[in-house]
C-alpha cells in the first residue's frame, strides 16, 4: 500500500428547521492503485459508466462507503470485489457529477 485515499460516509441529520442536511465523515486509508481491465471498461461502458480508478485496500479498511476522494477529486464507488486469495477488496471508482 503506497497511496492514501479518502473514504467518505454520508448521512443526513435534521437541522433546527427540520430540514435534512448532509453530514460527511471522512477517513483516510492506505491503498494502491491498479489498472482497470478491458473487460471492466467494456462492462461499465454498457451501463453508462466511465471507470477511472481501481483502488485496492485491506478489507478491514472498507466500511461500505460509496464516495471517495483522491487528489481533491470526488469519485463514486460503483462496484466492489473481494479478492478470494487475499484479505483485500477492490473499489472501482467513476467520476460523477454531483458526488
What are these regions (language model features)?
Residues 20-99:
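Short, conserved turn/kink motifs that form compact alpha/beta structural patches or helix kinks used as
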Residues 1-32:
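Extended boundary segments
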